[in-house]
C-alpha cells in the first residue's frame, strides 16, 4: 500500500470508522430479524431516543467545555422518583402521600428542574472554583445523589412508584397516530429542547463562550470570558435537562425506582462522541448529538430485539465507547 493510500485509509478510519462499525451491527440485527424495521419498532426507537436526546444535550454542553458528568444518570433517577411521588393519582391505593393532592405537572417540572439545577451548580462550583477535575467531581456527586435518592426511595416505601395521574400519563405517553406510525409527545418535547440548545450554542454569547472555553480556557479568560460563571451556568443547565429527562422517563415507563437512570450517562457520553462532540473541547453540533443518540438507541434496541444477552450488550457498548473515544483522540492528535 502506497504512503498516500495508507494516509487516506487512516484518515477515513479516524473520520468514519465508528459509523462503519455501527452500520455492520445494524446490518447484523436486520439480517437476524427483518421485522426490526417495522413502523411500530421505529416509533418505539424514536420515543426512546427522545428522552436520551434531552439527557445527551445536557452532557454535550459539558463535553464541549472539556468536562463530563458521571452523575447524569443518577440525577435522572432522582428526578424520576421525586416526580413520581408527586404525580400519583388520588385514587391510587398505594399513593405515597395519600393526603396530598396531585400536583400540577408544570409545578412538578419546576421542582425537579430546580433540584437538577442545584446539583449542577454544586458540580460547577467544585469544578470552576475548587479546580477539582470534572471526572472526580461528578463521580463523587454520582455516589451522593444515588445515596440521597435511595434514602428518599426507602422513606416512601422502597417499592416501584406507579399509578400516575391520567394527565401526567397522557403528557408522557401520549402520541399522534400517523397510520401505523406513532409520533409521541415526548418527541415534541425533545424537538423543543433541540431547538433551544441549537439557538443557545449558535446564536448567543453564552454559546460562543462555552466553545471558547472548550477550545482554550486560558485564551478565553484573556479575551474577557468569565470562565467560572459560564461553567456554573452550563452545569446548572445540564442538571435541568437531566431532571426533565428523568421526569419524562418515569412517565414513559409508567413507574420509577431508585435504580432508574443507571448507566444513562455512559450512553449519553457515547452518543455524544459518536455524534462528533470531541473530548478535546470546543467541537460539537446539536445535529451531531441527535444523530449519535439515534444511532446508539437503534443499536441498543436492536440488540435487545434480537435477544442478545444483556451482559454481551454491556461488552458491545463498552467497546463502542472505547473505539469512539480512541478515534476522537487520534483526530485531535493529528490536528495538534
Curated annotation (Swiss-Prot):
Q: What does this protein do?
A: Part of the ABC transporter complex MglABC involved in galactose/methyl galactoside import. Probably responsible for the translocation of the substrate across the membrane.
Q: Which PANTHER family match?
A: ABC TRANSPORTER PERMEASE PROTEIN YPHD-RELATED-RELATED, GALACTOSE_METHYL GALACTOSIDE IMPORT PERMEASE PROTEIN MGLC
Q: Which UniProt keywords apply?
A: Cell inner membrane, Cell membrane, Membrane, Sugar transport, Transmembrane, Transmembrane helix, Transport
Give the family from UniProt: Belongs to the binding-protein-dependent transport system permease family. AraH/RbsC subfamily.
Output the InterPro entries linked to this UniProt entry. Answer: ABC_transp_permease
MF term (GO), any = methylgalactoside transmembrane transporter activity
Q: How does it sit in the membrane?
A: Multi-pass membrane protein
Please verify whether the record's keywords include Lyase.
Answer: no
* Key word Transferase present: no
A Pfam family name for this chain?
BPD_transp_2
Instruction: List where the protein spans the membrane.
Output: 17-37, 53-73, 107-127, 128-148, 181-201, 227-247, 257-277, 279-299, 306-326
Report what the protein is called.
Answer: Galactose/methyl galactoside import permease protein MglC
UniProt organism field:
Escherichia coli (strain K12)
Listed under GO biological process in this entry are: DNA damage response; galactose transmembrane transport; methylgalactoside transport
